[in-house]
Amino acid sequence: DGIAPREIWLEAGKHGFLGYHVPEQYGGGGVDDYRFGAVMQEEVSDTGVIGSANGMTLHNDIVLPYYLSLANDDQKARWLPKMVTGEYITAIAITEPNAGSDMAGTKTTAVKKGDTYVVNGSKTFITNGINSDLVLTVCRTDPEAGHRGFSLIVLERGMKGFERGRNLDKLGMHAQDTAELFFD
């Protein structure tokens, strides 16, 4: 069905393949060396499960570093341990239907309402979009600020107004989910 079962993520977490560079205090391996990920990617490429492995590479090497550098201590304590075990799968949502990955054309907005943000818009071609529990979402928060008017907003599975569209058909990488996301 074009989606790697969550059990694969849990198994990867159990064997230390997820969050290896997350500090040990959050359950990670504490490895601060890019070569570990490179070796892992090479080994996985020989297994024939490259679709699910690419989702894990995105999780480990693209998304997790944002949480490590930008999340506050409470967020790290809440999210990082589950990212390491595979209980939480992550995604990053940049690409939009009418703008592609050109951030200057981002139409998705986030407007501050009290202590939270209300996000409106849509994203497409989001790796791990169906399975993800946490989606780091690029939003325009200040239209007057040009390139400085963007923010990364974390959207959690089950949040009101956050819907997943279909799992997109692709020519390859059939075991990797790629989704449309809608925010209203």
Provide a role label for each language-model segment:
Residues D1-K14:
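Short secondary-structure junction/hinge motifs that connect adjacent elements
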Residues K14-I89, T127-L134, G146:
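Internal helix-loop-helix
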Residues Y67, D102-T106, G129-N131, R164-N167:
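Short acidic, glycine/serine/threonine-rich loops at helix termini
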Residues M83, N98-S101, F125-N128, D142-E144, ...:
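Short Gly/Pro-enriched turn/cap motifs at secondary-structure boundaries
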Residues G105-T106, G158-D184:
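Flexible, small-/acidic-enriched active-site or ligand-binding loops
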Residues T108-V111:
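A structural signal for short hydrophobic beta-strand segments in well-ordered beta-sheet cores
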Residues T116-R164:
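A short core secondary-structure module
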